[in-house]
């Protein structure tokens, strides 16, 4: 934890950030293996759930409550996934992974944003991916864009897929503990329509790893 985040101030924070770190680690692994389709044909993480109340690496606890990893897995196991390969010298390569039987296309925009969410730079491209395959898009070199302000900016990639789904990736140039992240003020609205309850969050600055709890 201390390699990536400021050390938690209390036990509750320690529990939370440990789950976040687990989710990031497994997400990174699964997306890497999916990008290497042909060499690696699948990835299953251990473990899904617990059969007794215990502190464990399960993504769903004994009571059926989702941990961070379970929420992350809905995205990194999506049939159509956009991910980012980060190489040395700040080269970011978007990848499109297609696990369906139909051809898909995707429009991706790579942004460099500051910690207020303002766009400092962007690049857009489009790719088509055959069924059951992976497509590497054009690499994007951001060295000249982020050099000297690695603690002040982050990279975001937004993929809009032809099947109507969306992938979003965020990468920090440095570990989170070195990033000058602003304290965000988050507000929310709750809307009820019949049996459907919708919670909408609004933040005045980028807010990472936000969770919602309700009684």
Language-model segments: which ranges?
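Hydrophobic, well-ordered secondary-structure elements that form the walls
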Residues: 43, 94, 157, 201, ...
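Short, contiguous acidic/charged loop-to-helix segments that flank catalytic cores in large enzymes
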Residues: 13-18, 60-61, 126-132, 145, ...
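Terminal connector regions
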Residues: 111, 136-184
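Substrate-binding clefts and catalytic carboxylate motifs of secreted carbohydrate-active enzymes
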Residues: 1-104
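Intrinsically disordered, low-complexity Ser/Thr/Gly-rich stretches
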Residues: 181, 206-215
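Surface beta-strand/loop "capping" patches
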Residues: 74-110, 177-203
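Intrinsically disordered, low-complexity Pro/Gly/Ser/Thr-rich segments with frequent PxxP/GP/PP motifs
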Residues: 107-149, 215
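Short loop/turn segments at connectors of secondary-structure elements within structured domains
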Residues: 39, 102-106, 121, 149-151, ...
